[in-house]
């Protein structure tokens, strides 16, 4: 199956290209409740509606929390802490029915998904377990050099494959933002895959270039 960690909005392009596409996220917090008390997986709903996916919301994310906290803290207060086997099972089920699966990260690479009773689970553990190549998503503005370089060097040091960088909220001609991008490229050695302007509805990449970011993942 072909899976990758990419920005969720790319699904708009992939879905319209005629391929069978899907979305997956291990855990998401900061979600509203329906009138019946059940939680609405907000990020998943946004992708579903934006991309016009027929994929059911219920299979997009196995762990959904109300508090807008790091997932580990939300789970500590609300219960139902993330379990890696459950995350993997859900991912494999989505992969079995789709050609392309986009996996969105839960916070940054060092986001804790679980930390209680001596059990810990970090986003990097999920990426490694699911054998996902990744794309770093970053804001083009002030402070991005430090966050991008630290993320890239951490992932490279942990032998987690990184395909490149996508910059959000980009303003062409902005001196600082263009320098930020150049410095990130120079220091990390990673390609800049695209710079996404504010308000863009689609990822400014050719479908063939986008598809090349995905890799076949052996699921056993």
Predicted regions and their residues:
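Single conserved hydrophobic/aromatic residue that forms the stacking wall/gate
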Residues: 1-8, 12-13
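N-terminal phosphate/diphosphate-binding loop that engages ATP/GTP or pyrophosphate donors
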Residues: 14-81, 85, 92-93
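Hydrophobic anchor at the start of a short beta-strand
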Residues: 20-21, 101, 134, 162-163
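Short internal beta-strands
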Residues: 25, 135-138, 163-169
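Switch II (G3) loop of P-loop NTPases
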Residues: 87, 91-118
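Inter-motif core of Ras-like GTPase G domains
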Residues: 116-140
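Charged helix-capping and loop-helix junction motifs
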Residues: 116-124, 149-152, 177-182
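C-terminal lobe/tail of nucleotide-utilizing enzymes
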Residues: 153-220
């Amino acid at each position: 199956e072909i899976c990758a960690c990419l920005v969720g909005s790319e699904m708009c392009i992939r879905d319209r290209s005629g391929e069978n596409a899907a979305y997956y996220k291990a855990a998401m917090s900061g979600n509203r409740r329906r009138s019946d008390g059940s939680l609405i997986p907000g990020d998943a709903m946004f992708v579903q509606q934006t991309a016009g996916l027929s994929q059911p919301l219920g299979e997009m994310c196995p762990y959904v929390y109300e508090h807008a906290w790091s997932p580990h803290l939300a789970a500590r207060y609300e219960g139902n802490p993330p379990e890696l086997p459950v995350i993997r099972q859900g991912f494999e089920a989505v992969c079995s029915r789709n050609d392309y699966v986009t996996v969105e990260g839960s916070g940054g690479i060092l986001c804790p998904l679980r930390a209680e009773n001596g059990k810990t689970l970090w986003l990097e553990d999920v990426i490694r377990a699911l054998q996902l190549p990744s794309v770093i998503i970053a804001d083009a503005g002030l402070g991005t050099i430090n966050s991008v370089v630290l993320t890239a060097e951490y992932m490279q040091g942990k032998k987690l494959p990184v395909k490149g960088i996508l910059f959000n909220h980009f303003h062409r001609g902005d001196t600082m933002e263009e320098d930020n991008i150049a410095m990130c490229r120079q220091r990390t050695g990673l390609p800049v895959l695209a710079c996404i302007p504010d308000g863009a509805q689609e990822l400014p990449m050719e479908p063939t270039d986008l598809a090349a970011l995905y890799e076949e993942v052996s699921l056993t």
